[in-house]
Amino acid sequence: ANIKPALLTTHPFYKAAVKENIFICDEGENPIVIQFWDETASLIDFTKKKAVNWWQNKVTKYILSNGFDTIWNDNNEYDLEEKTAFSFFKKSKVKTSTLIPLQALLMTKASADATAKYYPNIRNHGVTRSGGLGIQKYAETWTGDNDTSWHSLKWSSSIGLGLSLSGIGLF
């Protein structure tokens, strides 16, 4: 199942999620609203324990319980142009821009943990589009949406070698 770390502002869960304070916020604790494809959305802040719990509950209820056993964490680059976005890391308020790889890692870990809890007797297999050091513990990655061409093969080979040097053997 392909899932994203952003919740559209038109999503039925959005208003309740704002009240639960699970999003990346500005200095005034208001959710940052970003352009997300052709809609607007807010990004879930996986440095917040309540956001991780919210995520895992939704993944379990709406995805895993419907028979899916693999989570594809997509669009988790956390490309925030908003410079006033803040997250909480180790009880300190920090600019989210400094935690971008961590957000992807924590999202992927939250998905992997929910899957492992729901399916304790199968080996977890997850996919992620983004992530930093340690991501290979929770999911494999892929090098993006390619086309069938020599050009794509050339760049995919280079990217694959770089990923392998970073400890990511599946790409």
Where are these regions (language model features)?
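Catalytic-domain carbohydrate-binding cleft regions of carbohydrate-active enzymes
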Residues: 1-171
